[in-house]
Each structure stands twice: as C-alpha cells, then as structure tokens.
Amino acid sequence: MARQLALVHGRAGHVPRVTCVTCAAMRGDAALATTAAATPDAHSAQDRGGGATGPCARATSVPRAVIASSLPRPPWRTAGGSPLAVGAGACPYTPAVRELVSIAPDGAELFVDGRVLRVRGLAPDSDHEVAGIAFRTMPDLGALRCVFATGNDVHFGETVCGHVDDASGHEVFTSEPGATPYPEVMSRAAVAEIASCGPAAVVVKGDLTNDGEDEDYDAFLQVWGEAFGERLLHVRGNHDSYRGQGFAAWDRQVRVLDGVTLALLDTARPFEVGGSLSDEQLTWLDELGRTAHQPVVVLGHHPVSRDDELAPPFPLLSDDATVRLVEVMARRTSLTCYLAGHTHRNLVRRIEGVLCAEVACVKDFPGGWAEYRVHERGIAQVFHRVQAPEAVAWAERTRRMFGGLYGAYAMGRLEDRSFVVATR
C-alpha cells in the first residue's frame, strides 16, 4: 500500500514508529510484540509503516488537561514547541494501552492509559515524543482555507453490539439497564467535539439508524441536525434502507466551501447490503469534475470493492460501480478522493491513482470521526477518537469484539488514519 503521508511533497518519513508492546500485540505484530517485550526500556522493532525510532517510556500519569510548559516536571518530552495536551477521564478497561491515534501539521492525538490526549501548538514537519510515543508532524501545507468533518455508522436504535449469530460464541455488548443507549452516547460526544473545531460543513455518510425506523431517524436529526443545522449533510446507508425505506435518499448533494467542494452520493440500494451508483449519478459527477474550479471531495456510504486480502466478508460498492467511479475520478483531476464508511474501519487504498479511504464508525470502537483541514497545498485528514469519559469507556469495552480481533481491524495503520490528499 502506498504511504499516503508522502502525497504532497513526495517525501517519506511522516509515519512514526509506535514502540509500545501493548500496541504491537493489539495490531497483530507478533514479532514486534515479542521483541519489545524482551527490551522493555528501549523498544526498537519496526512498526508496520516504518519511521523514526525512539525509546518507549513506561506508563506515566498524564493529567486530564495540562499545558506542558507550565509544569516544572512535565510527564513527556517535546522538541520544537510547547504543546497543549487535552485529555479525557481515564478508562478502566484498557489501562495499559498506548497508541498514536493521528498526526496533524500542528500536533498529534494519542491514547494513553485510558485517556485521549490531543497535543497542539507544534511546528510542522518536526519530531516529538509524548508519553513515550515518538512521532513526526505533517508537513507545512500552507494557509488554512476551511475545515469540514465527517462521521458515519452512527446506528441510532441499535441495542446489541458485536452480534454475528447465535452460534458464533462471540461476546456481545449492550448498554446498562436504564442507561442512555450507546449510539446516543457516542454521537453526542462526537457532535460536541466536532462543533468545537468550527467546521464549515459536517457530513454523516450513512447508517444513520440500525434498522431504518422513523423514530431512530428522528433521534439522529435531533442530535446531529440540531447541532449543525444547515451545515449538516447526510445520506442513507444500507441499514437505513433494508426494508425499502426512502428517507435521506438524495441521489446527489453538493456543498461549495472555501477551497473545496463536497459531492455526496447515495450508494445505498433498497433491500441490499451492498451499494451501487446510477448512470445519472456518474454522469453528474463527471460533469462536476469537468467544470470544477477547486478541489472536489467525493463521499458516499459504501467503499470501493477490491478482491484481495483486505476485502471484508460482506458486500461493498458493486464491482461495476467501483470501476466506473474510479474511471471518472482518474479522468477528472479535480476529483481528489473518495471517502466512505460501512466497514467500520480505517483503511486507505489507491486505485488507478485515486485515493479511496474508509473511516471507522462513531457507535463503537474506536468511536471516531474525521477532521479535514483544507490548506493551500493539500487536504489533511486527521482522525479523532471521542474524548468524553463515558464514550471512551464504551469504545474500550467494544475494542475486544469478535474474539479480540476487532480492535486492530477497526483502527488500521497510522497512514490509514492520518494522510494528506494532494489537490491535483
């Protein structure tokens, strides 16, 4: 897989090495976990994706919110700036986990011993270490034009998480009796954090509900619509149309922002898990790409399909729709990337030069949303985990779904979560 962080300047080296043994084991890197465990004070094995080395400090007590430069003995080291780190309450479920969640031109996000830490105020293209995790910030992309955000797979109305079938034997997860349903907990946390970044637009890319019930769609609108009003764009997913329901079924939507145009497509088809695109949708997108005077980001619920080892065991966008979508986007260079949901994971592919990204879900682990910073020389995707303590607790419970395999599947690699989209 191409290293997406090198798209703008053709440079490698923006994918740091995460040297925590726990992270290594969770990601399925058995060799890394074994090597790291043998050298606990200076882990040096290679994380998938490569990058700079650095010692893995033992767990530290990270305060809930702290300006590092104000502490006489800060619990981490930095180089090139005095960051602002903002964290949420600790989670009791995975107290030993330390992960680099994402990087940005001015900072990074980490998950450290049950807290989400956001570090800001750093210089672009610079090396740092926070809580024993080394990373390099994204390159300087020029002046910021605007910010937009996306979420997907919020599943209002869902009551059981992790169920496959009665014979699977997998542990399932539910909200405690009398507690706020977990889809609402996760969405409210995401909405509050998205609102704080002042987005020009917010896009929810399908699976608004679990089973297409009108009352659940109303609940979605109450949480997301009341927060963002006219800034909100949303479209249905397969869970919203299993029984032929017709809400949020707009074939195509467009929103022009400062520095970028958003094109949202309805890929869902009634009574089907998989998705498709009509001739009319593709003709419209082709014409939009031909006449656009600024970069266009294309969005939909279903990701492109590929018959390879990364393909999930359920339908995605149809093969025909995938081929035709990629053909249009490869021909029209203003169409910069395709962003989807549906798979509940972070994954980036490049097909015929077209960047196609999947973003993990809001409703369970990792409990995430994506921020897109539109700069003069590229668009940075920065994946975020929700910070609210009750949301972190639920996300960490569901990390272990499907026999413990879900965590690594859903998180993906760093370059699946943080990358730069070249404005071609």
Predicted regions and their residues:
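Extracellular ectodomain segments of secreted/surface proteins
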Residues: 83-85, 89-114
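Extended active-site neighborhood of metal-dependent phosphoesterases/phosphodiesterases
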Residues: 136-140, 214-287, 324-325, 350-358, ...
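Active-site environment of divalent metal-dependent phosphoester hydrolases
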Residues: 157-160, 210-215, 239-245, 270-273, ...
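Acidic/histidine-rich helix-loop elements
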Residues: 152-185, 242-248, 270-277, 312-314, ...
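His/acidic metal-ligating clusters that form di-metal
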Residues: 190-201, 272-355, 405-424
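A short C-terminal boundary segment appended to hydrolase-like catalytic domains
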Residues: 376-424
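Residue-level detector of structural "landmarks"
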Residues: 24-33, 43-58, 64-67, 73
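N-terminal active-site segment of His-dependent metallophosphoesterases
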Residues: 118, 123-213, 291
